């Protein structure tokens, strides 16, 4: 019922043209389209961006009007993957734990004012739970300086015009932690039904927490 077209890595006019083309085709079949404006750092679907480029609020009205997209993914400081920020971009608490920079809620507010009521999307918003990082690293993994978006910032975003928040990396971390822990405890096992069961349960636990306690989307399906 919906698709996402990410032309954010293209020059602005090319992004507009590509998104408009997808919208015109998809709308023939009643399919809604999510466009994207602003670049997130990281790797997604083999598209690599070394640095984030924040969404420019002055472009959003023109982009939405010309493309006809139904929702808009923006860049306000999130990024793809489990290593969302370099140590140099972060501060550290008294225990040496990395504290990521805050999201640019000022940009979000300005976009909301220019597009009142329009559905906004955040990609690259996994929190990278440190308990999963710890389990992975204690069981053969090598996730160095992995840090994500604090949940309190996601709660704030979810209370705004943001209607969709992508947290794929958190799910990957949950399953990987469960699988690594399983094999470290039972290295002689090889039946997928045995190690995927705990992985699914951990994934279920994670998303239940996110839906109920962070994203505020419980009961809204």
Residue locations for each model-derived region?
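Alpha/beta enzyme core
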Residues: 1-119, 130-135, 139-147, 151, ...
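C-terminal alpha-helical cap/extension of soluble enzyme domains
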Residues: 138, 149-221
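Short catalytic/ligand-gating loop segments at beta-alpha or beta-beta junctions
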Residues: 122-127
